[in-house]
Curated annotation (Swiss-Prot):
Post-translational modifications: Maturation of thiazole and oxazole containing antibiotics involves the enzymatic condensation of a Cys, Ser or Thr with the alpha-carbonyl of the preceding amino acid to form a thioether or ether bond, then dehydration to form a double bond with the alpha-amino nitrogen. Thiazoline or oxazoline ring are dehydrogenated to form thiazole or oxazole rings.
The entry's keywords: Amidation, Antibiotic, Antimicrobial, Bacteriocin, Hydroxylation, Methylation, Secreted, Thioether bond
Organism: Planobispora rosea
Residues found modified as N4-methylasparagine: N3
Cellular localisation: Secreted
Keyword Secreted tagged: yes
Sequence position, cross-link Pyridine-2,5-dicarboxylic acid (Ser-Cys) (with S-11): S1-C10
Position(s), cross-link Pyridine-2,5-dicarboxylic acid (Ser-Ser) (with C-10): S1-S11
Record protein name field: Thiocillin GE2270
Length: 14
């Protein structure tokens, strides 16, 4: 599930 605020689907904080 993409729930990040990096611009797109990323793994900043799962």
């Amino acid at each position: 599930s993409c729930n990040c605020v990096c611009g797109f689907c990323c793994s900043c904080s799962p």
